[in-house]
Each structure stands twice: as C-alpha cells, then as structure tokens.
C-alpha cells in the first residue's frame, strides 16, 4: 500500500470533507449500502462529511495518496453511560480505483489501534449481509451476532439484510 493513513483533525476537516466526497459518491454508485439510495452531489457529500467531523463522538481516518483520498473509516463512541468501553465502526469505504491495495485493512488497523490505546475494548458494526465487506470483517476476526432481514433499501431499490458483528480489542 502506498497510501498514508491519518486521523482527521479539526485543522484538516474542511479539506478532508471535500477530498472524501468523491469516495462517498463512488461507494454509493458501486451499490454499497452506506445509508444513501441515490449518490449525493459533490456539495451534499462534502457537507455530510463536514457534519460527521463536527460530531465530538466520532474519530475518522482517511487513506491518502498525495492529496487524493482513497478510503476512510469512522469510529463512533457509545453515547450511553454504560458503554464507555465500546464504539461502533461505520463507513469503511475504499474508492473502486484503489481497492486491492491493502487500504481497508490499514484503515481498520489504525482504528483498532486507536480504540485499544483509548481504553475501548469492544467494537460493533453492521454490514450488508452477503457483501464483500462481511467476508472481510470475518477474515479480520470479527464475530457474527446475527442478522436482520429487509433492513435497508439498496441503491437498486431492493431490500437487503444487515449482519451485526463485534470484535474485542485488547488494551494497548
């Protein structure tokens, strides 16, 4: 992998939001279930990323090749008082042009390292049932809890299930 993985900071948020907009658009155009049915416009995608970065409960990483964003992943800390040890993993995306270069595991590795060093011991996520992402998570040691049928409308208009997964993270 030639991409550098870095955590988004307040100082880099605006430029990163603009850089990640094409990644979100490409991910939706490729049919992935990431909360959008139609691809957002560049402006909508940029504003969506900016709003995510403004949420104090989130930490986001971006993989870059120079100024070009190739992929991303976000950690969302649990808001409940009984969950300071856990977080949700959302929006692992890699642009189609950059897939197969080890970017997704590098992003997940950065997130897991951060989680462990910050006292988080349990990560959870949901992913489209039967997707490539589900098989990657399984390969990376994530455990399947179960599934929910007809959970989300896909970009094609079909209802698709989601699989709930978790991973225990050792404290650093």
Over which residues does each language-model region extend?
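Acetyl-CoA-dependent GNAT
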Residues: 3-91, 95-96, 108-110, 114, ...
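Conserved GNAT acetyl-CoA-binding A-motif
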Residues: 108, 115-127
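Conserved catalytic-core motifs of GNAT/GCN5-like acyltransferases
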Residues: 124-126, 138, 143-161
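Short glycine/proline-centered loop/turn elements that form peptide/ligand docking sites
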Residues: 104, 108, 130-133, 149-156
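Glycine-rich phosphate-binding loop
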Residues: 98-101
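Short amphipathic helical patch at the helix-1/turn junction of helix-turn-helix
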Residues: 94, 127-128
């Amino acid at each position: 992998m030639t991409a550098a993985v870095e955590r988004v900071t307040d100082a880099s948020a605006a430029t990163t939001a603009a850089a990640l907009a094409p990644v979100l658009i490409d991910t939706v155009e490729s049919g992935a279930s990431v909360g959008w049915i139609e691809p957002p416009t560049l402006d909508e995608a940029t504003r969506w990323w900016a709003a995510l970065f403004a949420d104090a409960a989130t930490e986001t990483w971006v993989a870059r090749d120079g100024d070009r964003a190739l992929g991303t992943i976000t950690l969302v800390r649990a808001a409940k008082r009984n969950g300071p040890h856990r977080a949700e993993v959302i929006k692992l995306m890699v642009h189609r042009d950059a897939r197969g270069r080890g970017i997704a595991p590098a992003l997940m590795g950065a997130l897991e390292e951060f989680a462990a060093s910050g006292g988080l011991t349990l990560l959870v996520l949901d992913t489209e049932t039967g997707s490539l992402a589900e098989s990657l998570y399984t390969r990376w040691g994530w455990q399947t809890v179960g599934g929910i049928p007809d959970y989300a409308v896909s970009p094609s208009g079909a209802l698709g299930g989601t699989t709930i997964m978790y991973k225990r993270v050792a404290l650093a």
